[in-house]
Amino acid sequence: MDSNTMSSFQDILMRMSKMQLGSSSEDLNGMITQFESLKLYRDSLGEAVMRMGDLHSLQSRNGKWREQLSQKFEEIRWLIEEVRHRLKITENSFEQITFMQALQLLLEVEQEIRTFSFQLI
């Protein structure tokens, strides 16, 4: 993962963790957990691509990697919808900026994962 994407993940996670969204803090914690999981998955997929020919290693580590890939895309779509929803309902400019940046990052990561997966297929 390039350093800009890495720092974007870290920045957004830090700022989201500081937010207090009232009764929905449990939902926010779930979003933070999914962001972290997505970051780890994206990193591992990127490493496999960097070691081109490592498809067999990836398949042996996770025989159902295509199913996992599909699940990750579903998680990304859910996160995108959740972030869009939060963006619509919040009036706090700090939260709006954070969620706009989170949305942009999700779209970038979705594209990167698509690119990596096509290289591995």
UniProtKB/Swiss-Prot annotation:
It holds the Pfam family Flu_NS2. Its main location: virion. The keyword Transport applies. Keywords: Host nucleus, Host-virus interaction, Transport, Virion. It comes from Influenza A virus (strain A/Herring gull/DE/677/1988 H2N8). It is found in: Virion; Host nucleus. The lineage of its organism: Viruses, Riboviria, Orthornavirae, Negarnaviricota, Polyploviricotina. GO terms for cellular component: host cell nucleus; virion component. This is Nuclear export protein. Interacts with protein M1. May interact with host nucleoporin RAB/HRB and exportin XPO1/CRM1.
